[in-house]
Amino acid sequence: MLLLNKLKKVIICSAIFFSILFLNGSNYAIVSPTKDFYVNDYANLLSEETKKYILQTNQDLNQKTGAQIVVVTVKNLEGKSIEEYANQLFREFGIGDKEKNNGLLLLCSYEDRMFRVEVGYGLEGCLPDGKTGRLQDEYIIPYLRENKFDEGIRNGYSAFLGEVAEEYNITIDRREEATIKITSTQFV
């Protein structure tokens, strides 16, 4: 009987421990890559045309260079900082060629109203922090401020795609230039 009581206590304590662990862990779960990999539109912000464009141009980019530009939209960051969330996504998705570390992540959190670009070390030469900030300010942020997420993300993606293509001295099939060039001061 004494052994049975100890066993019950161990089972109850274990159940409590794993419940707490599971509940805390669920606050920090991040999304998994979709079957399309390059487009992970969990916040439903992108048009089918934009998704198709990102998929087609990425396939060409990856085939020619091994580089990958992954777009992820989420409803919110589930309590994480955008830097932490983007870093974890970048690592877990395995973006870019493993040896060249030439991946690029464009992350948009709809409810948090935040956008982040995560650059692999292999692309930091052509996309240093200052340049990624300027590209966001010029091609993405003005649209996001106006709730034009599809346009902003597509324009930003096109701008980053152009920079990566230029770095590798290649032409991307079906590549379109950003539709409108706007500075962030026009929306202040």
Name the predicted role of every residue range.
Residues 2, 21-24, 38:
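Intrinsic disorder/low-complexity signature
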Residues 2-12:
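Bacterial N-terminal signal peptides that target proteins for export
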Residues 13-22:
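Bacterial N-terminal signal peptides
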Residues 26-187:
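Folded, non-transmembrane soluble domains that reside on the lumenal/extracytoplasmic side of membranes
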